[in-house]
């Protein structure tokens, strides 16, 4: 498939917590869709090595969820550094979208952007400065058309690739049911 400035990059990170000043990225996944939200390519799904000290700093919620999903074990066994993850992800994205063209797409994507800005700046700079945040649409629908919220439910696996797929499906739902386009 050719590089297309209209393609959209969807990203999800799993982190050790919510504070970029103390927490770290432990998983990244990316998908590329066309502008109609059809998935055209799946990028690498990477567990990013972090030290036992960093992992021990996770709060109970993160210990439980990332432990049960197997992510903590994958992170401990990983040979992938943050720099490796940046390079592999950019190599993938550059096959489908020119640098600076796609907004960063996903759920609560502002949080992911904060971590990319702190730890993976070269990757953050690959995106346009705008965001397509499914969470924003969800919050508006919850307030303006709460009955519509019953039509979509998420599994919330807190695994990066599954979370991205759910974000795309959720945006497809809002497009059809709310925007009617």
Curated annotation (Swiss-Prot):
Give all residue intervals belonging to the Exonuclease domain.
8-171
Could you tell me the keywords of this UniProt record? Cytoplasm, Exonuclease, Hydrolase, Nuclease
Top-level lineage group: Bacteria
Cellular compartment(s): Cytoplasm
**InterPro entries, sorted:** Exonuclease_RNaseT/DNA_pol3, Oligoribonuclease, RNaseH-like_sf, RNaseH_sf
Instruction: Mention one GO molecular function.
Output: nucleic acid binding
Nuclease: is it a keyword of this entry?
Answer: yes
- One of its Pfam families is RNase_T
Q: Where is the active site?
A: 129
What EC designation does it have?
3.1.15.-
Gene Ontology biological process? DNA metabolic process
Main localization of the protein? Answer: cytoplasm
Q: Which GO terms describe its cellular component?
A: cytoplasm
Q: Which Gene3D superfamilies did the record assign? A: Ribonuclease H-like superfamily/Ribonuclease H (3.30.420.10)
- What does this protein's UniProt record list under function? 3'-to-5' exoribonuclease specific for small oligoribonucleotides.
Which PANTHER family does this entry report, sorted A to Z? OLIGORIBONUCLEASE, MITOCHONDRIAL
Protein family: Belongs to the oligoribonuclease family.
Q: Which protein are we looking at?
A: Oligoribonuclease
Q: Which organism is it from?
A: Shewanella frigidimarina (strain NCIMB 400)
Its lineage opens with: Bacteria, Pseudomonadati, Pseudomonadota, Gammaproteobacteria, Alteromonadales
């Amino acid at each position: 498939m050719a590089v297309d400035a209209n393609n959209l990059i969807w990203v999800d990170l799993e982190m050790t917590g919510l504070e970029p000043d103390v927490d770290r990225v432990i998983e990244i996944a990316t998908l590329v869709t066309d502008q109609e939200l059809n998935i055209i390519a799946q990028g690498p799904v990477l567990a990013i090595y972090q030290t036992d000290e960093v992992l021990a700093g996770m709060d109970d919620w993160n210990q439980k969820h990332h432990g049960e999903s197997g992510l903590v074990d994958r992170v401990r066994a990983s040979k992938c550094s943050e720099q490796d993850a940046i390079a592999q992800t950019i190599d993938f994205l550059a096959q489908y979208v020119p640098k600076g063209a796609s907004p960063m797409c996903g759920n609560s994507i502002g949080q992911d952007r904060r971590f990319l800005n702190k730890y993976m700046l070269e990757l953050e700079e690959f995106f346009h400065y705008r965001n397509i945040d499914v969470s924003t649409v969800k919050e508006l629908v919850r307030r303006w058309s709460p009955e519509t919220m019953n039509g979509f439910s998420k599994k919330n696996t807190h695994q990066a690739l599954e979370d991205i797929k759910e974000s795309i499906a959720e945006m497809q739902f809002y497009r059809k049911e709310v925007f009617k386009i």
